[in-house]
Amino acid sequence: MKTKQSKILKSIYRPMHCDEFDLWADLSSNDYVEDLMTNHRYSRKKAQVEASKSFKTALPAGMLTPNNHFRTYEHDSQAVGYLWFSLEDNSAFLSDIMLIPEFQGKGMGRDFIRAFLNELASQGAFEVELRVSPDNQRALNLYKEFGFRITGFDMSLLLEPELSVIR
């Protein structure tokens, strides 16, 4: 009788390695550029300038910026996701979480968030906040599954130079 062997796939949530930081920063910056273009109607050039400025302001010492933490999610020995959060006074802010596109929709995002929330709980954190793009319905639904609730809305208005008076 033949038996079918199944390969056991292993997922690991771990601190990001130094050599992964630049790759993550490029991926994250590109995502932020797309977000700024879509949700703020920035030109690509303006979005790239803003994204670069934001990263330099938020992470002046890169991976060594105090109170900022970086994680990698591995699946079957391959890095498939990255996460950046800050933790201060037992309150966390999730600045970025991403899964490589070909690994989305397979339950890994759920496992990644669960591992992150368990880490925070084990460190005594009492809350976590985040911002999500309004057009990212998949992420909104996932966060709601974990009990996140909407606490406000970011709003913006582009002022056009040719408008001298707003009525």
Model regions and ranges:
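Structured loop/turn residues at beta-strand edges in well-structured enzyme cores
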Residues: 78, 123, 149
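Terminal substrate-recognition subdomain of acyl/acetyltransferases
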Residues: 2-4, 156-167
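Conserved beta-strand-loop-alpha-helix junction that forms the acyl-donor binding cleft
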Residues: 130-140, 156-161
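Acetyl-CoA-dependent GNAT
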Residues: 6, 11, 15-95, 100-102, ...
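Conserved acetyl-CoA-binding loop-helix of GNAT-fold acetyltransferases
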Residues: 99, 105-122, 137, 141-145
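Conserved acetyl-CoA-binding loop of GNAT-fold acetyltransferases
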Residues: 144-153
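Conserved GNAT acetyl-CoA-binding A-motif
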Residues: 120-131, 154
